[in-house]
């Protein structure tokens, strides 16, 4: 299925990419992250296991088991903190 990926903050900087369209076989948020990590290189580093990454699907915060649908917009970003 085709999905639209949007990268934010340090993930965007690490990848050198703000957005891309992906033809993915991932069924949910967790399997999408695994698929992206498997690309290796900057993807493996930016989305490494243990590195906190938040996922939003169609602008709604997603859990690992949140399903993906054809044409979904998926945002990936680090947790935001402030003071």
Model-derived regions, located:
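Ubiquitin-like/PB1-type beta-grasp interaction modules and other compact soluble beta-rich domains
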Residues: 1-82
């Amino acid at each position: 299925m085709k999905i639209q990926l949007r990268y934010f903050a340090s993930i965007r900087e690490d990848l050198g990419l703000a957005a891309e369209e992906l033809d993915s076989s991932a069924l949910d948020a967790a399997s999408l992250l695994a698929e992206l990590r498997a690309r290796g290189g900057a993807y493996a580093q930016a989305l490494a296991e243990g590195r906190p990454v938040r996922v939003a699907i169609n602008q709604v915060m997603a859990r690992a088991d949140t399903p993906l649908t054809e044409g979904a917009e998926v945002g990936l970003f680090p947790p935001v903190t402030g003071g």
